[in-house]
Amino acid sequence: MIHSKKLTLGICLVLLIILIVGYVIMTKTNGRNAQIKDTFNQTLKLYPTKNLDDFYDKEGFRDQEFKKGDKGTWIVNSEMVIEPKGKDMETRGMVLYINRNTRTTKGYYFISEMTDDSNGRPKDDEKRYPVKMEHNKIIPTKPLPNDKLRKEIENFKFFVQYGDFKDINDYKDGDISYNPNVPSYSAKYQLKNDDYNVKQLRKRYNIPTNKAPKLLIKGDGDLKGSSVGSKNLEFTFVENKEENIYFTDSVQYTSSEDTSYESN
């Protein structure tokens, strides 16, 4: 009888320890997930910024990477990648460097085509067309081969200008992950075609699939805040060995000393 009571007590003690450990782990995970969501929400508040000139007066997270007096530079990037079955992968997008010190913006529009060389190895053929921005207008700074490309560049809109995440907290069944070794973190959501941002992308791009995309929000760097690291959005419509269709976007605030670009 005494042995039975000791055994029962021992089992209860083990179960209690398991419950306590489980509760601690769950609490820690929930706290970290909330911190990840809060970190992303700070970035998503920038959407939409319809007038890119507004970035001259916006300040992001500053740390010791910034020199005294440096107001920083915003880097905005949007690109659409389409690889239909049996065809080459083509990427079209634009990058702008919005310098808050000089209140000037330069960058480039790019068209990249992934093909195979004579040995069957992947080859990335990218062409860049330098641009500047004045009064929220994109202006090519070098002659272009045709008017179609000129209109494409002048009419280009970054996702940050029309994307809107006011309903982000209503997204259901998000898959949140965290890797402390990098550190990196992400949140993934399955969207529907009636989602506002999905409709905006379909309005602006000829997306050759009716599949609704998954939204992946990913970042790296210190969760508490750091100018070293990045946060990116990715809308993946199709992803497999034969076909890839996805859109990526990023808005990054960094020290002006760390920014450089090349155009050809």
UniProtKB/Swiss-Prot annotation:
Pfam families assigned: DUF576 (PF04507)
First-listed, main subcellular location of the protein, grouped into a coarse class: membrane
Keywords tagged on the record: Cell membrane, Membrane, Transmembrane, Transmembrane helix
Family statement drawn from the similarity comment of this UniProt entry: Belongs to the staphylococcal tandem lipoprotein family.
UniProt-recorded name of the protein: Uncharacterized protein SA2269
Superkingdom of the organism of origin: Bacteria
Transmembrane domains' residue ranges: 7-27
UniProt keyword Phosphoprotein present: no
Alphabetical list of Gene3D superfamilies matching this protein: 2.50.20.40
UniProt keyword Isomerase present: no
Membrane topology: Single-pass membrane protein
Annotated compartments: Cell membrane
GO cellular component: plasma membrane
